[in-house]
């Protein structure tokens, strides 16, 4: 028996596109002699549809298209994730569901029992937990189907279960021979190995081969990495799909496979591929085929430019240098050299005259006051204004270039360098930016070495460096990880060996700059706690650094 694992990249709410992907994949599976094709969680609608689920017309269309899809595909049974209505008289109105489609109709269906409500997940807002998982017979084998979170309640892999029920235990007590999990599980650093650990635990514990079919593609801030897997009954990984690309795996149940050992690329390679896919999908799914990047000659804009070029192609990327009176010659040279290395269009628009015009206009109002960060921010806002004008005129998406460390500290300017439609590296700490830049330069230098090696500077005043107002990035990123990822208290972070005054300053700035981050463009989520939908803090609050 052959089973096709169809790792597709859906567009949320684009039924025509998603059905086209499903039809093409089922045709490939049928041609390859497969007995069953499997598609990811909510593959008909795309995940996560968020408040589209509150629109009755959207649910109606989803059900209409599901029945239409069933009638169009013949000759191969398949599993498809979709949204069903809750037939019960109480609870939330919807179910996160999966259907077995065979012979032109929905033959059987089941649903998701465990609904995540943490970080970026908010499924209890819309869905009622399903009463039944899907179980069906396939060539004298009993197949059980779970949906994403249903397999994440395994105590063996990381402490105590977080749910009262265990869908897997219930399925295995019913005697399933094959376990399938359809997922829309977003990427974070090192999540792939964790998923594999769970699958291995399940397969070995229940002596059941386990299939994992994951969505791929970028949907807003979330990156779905695919990496679908098949683990045999002994817990050995025997098949694995591409990371960050559509794929179709075929598992032959009668074939003997060698174990795949150490399947994961380096962290830098994985993060870079995720950012490239996320930038491409966000741009194209939003209708943009061209992007703009402001090139300062620094490492952050260089990193974003490389990602943009690899995501969109050199012909669809323009780099803009906007030197001020404080921009060094080496910054101007490095910006142009980078653009040449990437083969992207390069334009230079000096801002000297505009900057002086601003200062002249404000001269009387600012009479007697010393120049400070106000004048620095004027430069950033001039640049933001020019970039948005170019975006507007040429229909290109502006990519902002701030990293996570700077955004955490408010070391950025509202309506200036924060301008844009997508914050590509807003979840990349500065120390990781350096790691990515060095990775990009292997084996051939793309980002000028001087850009990486010289002290980082916003160049908004003479002889400025980032460390004039920020701790060294190794220290800053360590404190931020402790506070944001590990949720450690002030005292616990100090006990790690950091200076109390430094910790207090970092946590205070993290708190007071919430208002800036609320106005930032959406950013691509890479870590387990990014700024955005999964981190919800009040703006007007006490300043005690918890």
Report residues per predicted region.
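ATP/NTP-dependent adenylation/nucleotidyl-transfer catalytic domains that generate, transfer
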Residues: 233, 259-297, 301-546
């Amino acid at each position: 028996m052959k089973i096709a694992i169809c790792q597709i990249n859906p567009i949320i709410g684009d039924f025509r596109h998603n059905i086209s992907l499903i039809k093409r994949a089922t045709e490939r599976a049928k041609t390859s002699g497969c007995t069953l094709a499997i598609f990811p969680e909510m593959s008909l609608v795309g995940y996560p549809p968020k408040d589209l689920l509150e629109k009755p017309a959207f649910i109606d269309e989803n059900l209409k298209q599901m029945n239409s899809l069933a009638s169009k595909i013949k000759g191969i049974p398949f599993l498809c994730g979709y949204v069903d209505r809750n037939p019960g008289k109480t609870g939330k109105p919807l179910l996160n569901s999966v259907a077995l489609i065979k012979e032109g109709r929905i033959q059987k269906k089941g649903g998701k029992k465990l609904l995540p409500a943490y970080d970026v997940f908010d499924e209890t807002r819309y869905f009622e937990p399903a009463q039944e998982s899907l179980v069906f017979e396939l060539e004298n084998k009993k197949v059980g189907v779970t949906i994403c979170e249903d397999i994440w309640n395994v105590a063996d892999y990381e402490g105590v279960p977080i749910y009262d029920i265990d869908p897997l235990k219930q399925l295995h007590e019913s005697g399933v021979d094959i376990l399938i999990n359809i997922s829309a599980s977003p990427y974070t650093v090192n999540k792939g190995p964790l998923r594999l650990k769970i699958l291995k635990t399940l397969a070995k514990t229940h002596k059941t081969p386990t299939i994992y079919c994951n969505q791929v593609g970028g949907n807003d801030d979330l990156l779905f990495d695919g990496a679908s897997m098949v683990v045999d009954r002994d817990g050995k990984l025997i098949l694995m799909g591409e990371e960050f690309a559509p794929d179709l795996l075929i598992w032959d149940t009668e074939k003997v496979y060698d174990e795949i050992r150490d399947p994961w690329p380096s962290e830098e390679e994985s993060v870079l591929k995720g950012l490239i896919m996320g930038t491409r999908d966000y741009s194209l799914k939003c209708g943009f085929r061209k992007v703009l990047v402001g090139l300062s000659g620094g490492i952050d804009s260089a990193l974003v430019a490389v990602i943009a070029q690899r995501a969109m192609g050199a012909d669809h990327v323009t780099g803009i240098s906007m030197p001020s009176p404080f921009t060094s010659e080496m910054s101007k040279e490095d910006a142009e050299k980078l653009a040449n290395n990437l083969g992207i269009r390069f334009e230079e628009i000096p801002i000297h005259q505009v900057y002086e015009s601003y200062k002249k206009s404000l001269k009387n109002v600012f009479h007697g006051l010393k120049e400070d960060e106000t004048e620095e921010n004027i430069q950033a806002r001039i640049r933001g204004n020019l970039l948005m004008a170019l975006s507007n005129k040429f229909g290109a998406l502006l990519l902002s270039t701030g990293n996570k460390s700077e955004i955490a500290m408010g070391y950025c300017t509202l309506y200036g360098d924060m301008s844009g439609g997508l914050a590509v590296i807003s979840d990349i700490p500065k120390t990781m930016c350096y790691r990515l830049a060095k990775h990009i330069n292997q084996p051939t230098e793309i980002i000028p070495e001087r850009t990486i090696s010289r002290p980082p500077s916003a160049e908004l005043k003479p002889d400025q460096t980032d460390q004039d107002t920020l701790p060294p990035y190794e220290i800053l990123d360590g404190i931020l990880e402790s506070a944001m990822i590990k949720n450690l208290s002030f005292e616990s972070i100090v006990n790690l060996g950091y200076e109390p005054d430094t910790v207090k300053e970092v946590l205070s700035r993290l708190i007071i700059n919430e208002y800036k981050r609320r106005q930032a463009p959406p950013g691509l989520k890479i870590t387990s706690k990014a700024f955005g939908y999964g981190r919800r803090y009040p703006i007007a609050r006490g300043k005690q650094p918890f």
